[in-house]
A protein has these predicted regions:
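Preference for extracellular/luminal or secreted protein segments
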Residues: 1-258
Length: 258
């Protein structure tokens, strides 16, 4: 068994040459083979192969997504969502008081469309008017006019961010990136003192480090549809927050608590 090889036949030939040249000892090769065979024996793979149970039968897949499993998933989501802080006493949000919601999703991951559509649909069913953020076109070669504070205030009653920055192989960071050259536009949360703002992380529980100005912050740990549903239930006060953070969402920074 050779792991992480570029070409199996090539690596097998290298191993044979190493054995012939004395770089690889017979004892080391025997040890490696013994470990592999022992692992298979411990898992009873030979017996399962003989019994025809090495791979589950296709009909066993029917259990996936059954009512019991869905109930477990809903319970996990309900118990996981964590209110990290709400120092502005914003929650629960109300579809009358906070009717017009500017919605911004960050991450640009493959799941973004699904996540956004699920969250928007959940919120609209609760009676909110969801207004998705549209990236501005910046052309600094000519004079540009940006919204004034009062113009922004008059358009929105609430701003909701969703951090959907998924971890991936060879992805070296899971930080937030903004569509805001020189701090321009409405992607970066300059307006937290103007319009109530809440940040929800569906992946990385440490995003508060990148949005220290946000006063209401929620960690949900997963962008599964049922987790999104649970977040909306808690945002609107239909379910209480039960989650206990498994990490330090304040990243050891006292100022992030406020």
């Amino acid at each position: 068994m050779i792991l992480f090889n570029k070409d199996y036949a090539e690596d097998l030939e290298y191993m044979k040459r190493g054995l012939a040249d004395g770089i690889l000892s017979e004892a080391r090769l025997e040890e490696a083979v013994t470990r592999i065979l022992a692992a298979k024996a411990a898992l009873k793979l030979p017996e399962k192969r003989i019994a025809g149970t090495l791979a589950p039968k296709r009909e066993n897949l029917d259990v996936i997504g059954c009512d019991l499993h869905r109930a477990w998933a809903m319970e996990c989501a309900d118990r996981a969502v964590t209110l990290v802080k709400d120092t502005q006493h914003l929650l629960p949000i109300d579809p009358v008081k906070h009717h017009r919601v500017l919605f911004e999703i960050l991450g640009k991951c493959p799941s973004e469309k699904r996540v956004a559509e699920r969250f928007i649909a959940d919120m609209e069913r609760k009676g909110f008017e969801m207004i998705p953020y549209e990236e501005e076109v910046f052309d600094f070669s000519k004079p540009m006019r940006f919204e004034t504070v009062e113009e922004f205030r008059s358009k929105y009653d609430l701003v909701v961010y969703i951090g959907n920055v998924e971890n991936a192989s060879n992805k070296t960071t899971a930080r937030l990136n903004w569509h805001a050259p020189y701090g321009a536009g409405n992607n970066i949360p300059w307006f937290v003192e103007v319009v109530p703002t809440v940040f929800i992380s569906l992946q990385n529980p440490y995003h508060l480090l990148d949005v220290p100005m946000v006063k209401t912050y929620i960690n949900a740990y997963s962008n599964h549809d049922l987790m999104i549903d649970a977040v909306v239930e808690k945002l609107t006060g239909r379910s209480e927050f039960k989650g206990v953070s498994p990490v330090d969402p304040f990243c050891g920074k006292e100022y992030l608590r406020y």
